[in-house]
Amino acid sequence: MATSPVLFLLLAVFAAGASAATFNIKNNCGFTIWPAGIPVGGGFALGSGQTSSINVPAGTQAGRIWARTGCSFNGGSGSCQTGDCGGQLSCSLSGRPPATLAEYTIGGGSTQDFYDISVIDGFNLAMDFSCSTGDALQCRDPSCPPPQAYQHPNDVATHACSGNNNYQITFCP
């Protein structure tokens, strides 16, 4: 089966405009946390003082990253005191409240990204969340106000970042 030159050109143009975002996650807590992410990121242990990264493809919508605490896993199964996602190390479900959430939608190429912190599902850890060219958001306690974090579904706390950027999430800043 021959590949059409037009199809190849279209794929090349769309691929050139799309880019992934890297989310650098730092644990400043004095204990291990288990960051989790959906639809990208799964879950993993992150010791005190450690940093890890998650690559999120362009076009990812309604993503969220949170830190689980008080976890115990045997292989891929176990439980967490906060943010547990069905007893799995690698999450495919949202975490059980309470969990402080870093929420995002990644555009493609020059399309804008959007991000926010949400405590609608409760608060379990202080968090800083920033885009390399956007606002630095800080939520240090359950009462962090808009525009720093969503407290209620009708709050205005979403921030925009130009496309082709990376993000920093710090737990226990």
Swiss-Prot record:
Biological process annotations from GO: defense response
Keywords: Pathogenesis-related protein, Plant defense, Signal
Classification via SMART domains: THN
Keyword Endoplasmic reticulum: no
Family matches, as Pfam families: Thaumatin
Signal peptide start and end residues: 1-20
Description of what induces expression: By pathogen infection.
Keyword Signal: yes
Annotated family: Belongs to the thaumatin family.
Name of the molecule in the record: Thaumatin-like protein PWIR2
Organism: Triticum aestivum
